[in-house]
Amino acid sequence: MVHIHAEGPAFFCWIPKLFGKRVISTIHGLDWDREKWRGSVASKFIRGGEKNAVKYADEIIVLSKDVQKYFLETYGRETHFIPNGVNRPEVREAKLITDHFGLEKDSYILFLGRLVPEKGIRYLV
């Protein structure tokens, strides 16, 4: 069995099939639609990977319900929804953190995520 992560690498998921291997493709998101790839040759290649995953992968795993819906509506392809998981953090009293960093209530905004256009940080700032 071969497990391929992301749409770009999925372009090549037909190769293991030549050797009789089962292929699982995990799609982390619609990479071809990310702002940094839009309108580029890379976007077309990545989209080709998505189509090859649909055509050749024995199973497709997606990380969000929206992507699952997209694959069903666009390709009629059933997928397995397995969300990313995290360990629950230790709950601390907010006062411990605000006192430590000298923060006042309603005087700050916290953003956790990659600094990439699709996260929309420009709307937050």
Regions found by a protein language model. Name each.
Residues 63, 82, 111-113:
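Short hydrophobic "strand-cap" motifs at the C-terminus of beta-strands
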Residues 91-103:
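A short helix/loop element that forms part of the nucleotide-sugar donor recognition site in Leloir-type
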Residues 10-11, 26-41, 56-59, 89:
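A short, histidine- and acid-enriched strand-loop-helix "catalytic/donor-clamping" loop
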Residues 102-119, 125:
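Conserved donor-binding/catalytic core segment of Leloir-type glycosyltransferases
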Residues 66, 85:
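Carbohydrate-associated surface elements
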